[in-house]
């Protein structure tokens, strides 16, 4: 908890008044995560109004129906001019304004051996921490969409140029297709750099499907010539 807070507020220098913490409120047979809440209060100086308690759906993480699991604690950032805690829990607006999760700390302390079975304490509990790198980049760069960060926006704009269209950052069919092409071109470049080629089996088939979907969305944009290699080359550059 202290490491996460130190990184976000001192290294990245995010304003603390735009951050809110969530912890597990407890459920039947599972205690509330009072320990995490107490540590957050000590580390941040926040009161209860900025350390929110949520249930299983939001603040209890598991790998699936079985396996390691445990309560989690999330850090959320507010996109917009006036951080409004009363809006917490709402989906961000179409323009991206609102609260968005940027960090999750999972306290792995239980194991579920069978689907629907009881939870047993893990002999060696651990902490699984996950931060959304592109979400954090969006926060730092002052944009509300991952596709508007410098690494992806250039690919989106290149796709728009090839298609002879304008990217507006909306949820229109054209803009969605441009984002798909940008994302999938990057995936294609990264996989091929690792030696994966489009084939008919295993991970090679996954790459083939990714490329096929990118090309399909290019066709939806009216692109009738080969184009995916151009966007992938920009990733390499």
Report the location of each language-model feature.
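Short, intrinsically disordered, charge-balanced linker/junction segments flanking boundaries
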Residues: 236-237
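Structured aminoacyl-transfer and RNA-binding surfaces used for tRNA recognition/handling
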Residues: 1-233
């Amino acid at each position: 908890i202290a490491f996460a807070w130190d990184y976000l507020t001192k290294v990245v220098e995010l304003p603390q008044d735009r951050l809110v913490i969530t912890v597990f409120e407890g459920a039947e047979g599972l205690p509330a995560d009072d320990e995490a809440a107490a540590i957050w209060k000590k580390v941040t100086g926040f009161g209860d109004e900025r350390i929110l308690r949520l249930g299983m759906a939001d603040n209890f993480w598991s790998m699936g129906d079985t396996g390691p699991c445990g309560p989690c604690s999330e850090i959320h950032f507010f996109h917009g001019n006036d951080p409004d805690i009363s809006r917490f829990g709402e989906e961000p607006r179409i323009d991206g304004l609102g609260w968005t999760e940027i960090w999750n700390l999972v306290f792995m302390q239980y194991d579920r051996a069978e689907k629907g079975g009881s939870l047993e304490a893990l002999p060696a509990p651990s902490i699984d921490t996950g931060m959304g790198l592109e979400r954090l980049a969006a926060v730092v760069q002052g944009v509300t969409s991952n596709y508007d960060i410098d690494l992806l926006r250039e690919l989106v704009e290149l796709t728009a140029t090839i298609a002879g269209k304008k990217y507006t950052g909306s949820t229109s069919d054209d803009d969605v297709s441009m984002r798909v092409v940008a994302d999938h071109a990057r995936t294609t470049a990264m996989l091929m750099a690792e030696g994966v080629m489009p084939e008919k089996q295993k991970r090679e088939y996954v790459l083939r499907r990714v490329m096929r979907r990118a090309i399909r969305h290019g066709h939806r944009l009216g692109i009738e010539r080969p184009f995916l290699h151009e966007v992938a080359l920009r990733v390499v550059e």
